[in-house]
Regions:
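Histidine-centered catalytic micro-motifs
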Residues: 63-75
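N-terminal metal-binding scaffold of metallo-dependent hydrolase/deaminase domains
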Residues: 1-47, 60-61
Length: 199
């Protein structure tokens, strides 16, 4: 039990983990940003009468969702006309995705997409994600542009650049360096981290 004032979050239902059933009338006590106590809402109110309480009738409290594979920049392709229907996956990549989306991305477009998708994730309950960016014309510091938005939104994000020689051998090397720079930029901790990603 933590000392000091806490915050009681009191929903109608608590889903704590997959091993236990949902619990009606249960909530949590938060102290210094961490869950300190889990139990029936009435018990929490009795045990911690001086804590601020947030009643949440009609609500469910549960851990955030995890999106383990996302390409946030892909949201920018919504509504771009293809001219004709792709005849397969490779024609889709070669005739549409690479020239119309990935090869045109710059920092401004990347940050707009990141902001948009982070907002959608938060609104849908996703709090943790792994993003793979592929935008050869945006190097260097494209991942740092993403990181700035993710940090401001308060999500836990793992950011990576798809290092590939699709555009050129030099682009592949720059992608590796981009990942290394992100890994180094996140060494001090925080909600954002980087990983090495190749394709």
């Amino acid at each position: 039990m933590g000392a000091g004032p806490g915050l009681l979050i009191q929903p109608d239902w608590l889903v704590a983990d997959a091993r236990n059933p949902p619990r009606a009338g249960w909530g949590v006590r938060v102290v210094n940003g961490l869950i300190d106590t889990v139990g029936p809402n009435s018990d929490l109110s009795d045990r911690y009468p001086d804590d601020e309480a947030i009643p949440a009738p009609g609500r469910i409290l549960m851990p955030g969702f995890v999106n383990s594979h996302v390409h946030m920049y892909g949201v920018l392709a919504h509504g771009i006309p293809t001219g004709s229907a792709p005849t397969g996956f490779w024609p889709f990549l070669e005739d549409f995705w690479w020239p119309q989306v990935e090869d045109r991305l710059d920092h401004e477009m990347i940050t707009a997409a990141t902001d948009w998708v982070c907002t959608e994730m938060l609104l849908s309950g996703t709090t943790t994600f792994l993003d793979i960016l592929e935008a050869p014309a945006s190097l260097p510091e494209a991942l740092l542009a993403e990181k700035d938005i993710v940090d401001r939104r308060g999500l836990r994000g793992v950011l990576s650049f798809e290092a590939t020689e699709r555009s050129s051998p030099e682009s592949g090397q720059m992608g590796l360096l981009e990942n290394l720079a992100m890994i180094d930029a996140c060494r001090d901790g925080g909600l954002t981290s980087g990983i090495m990603y190749t394709h």
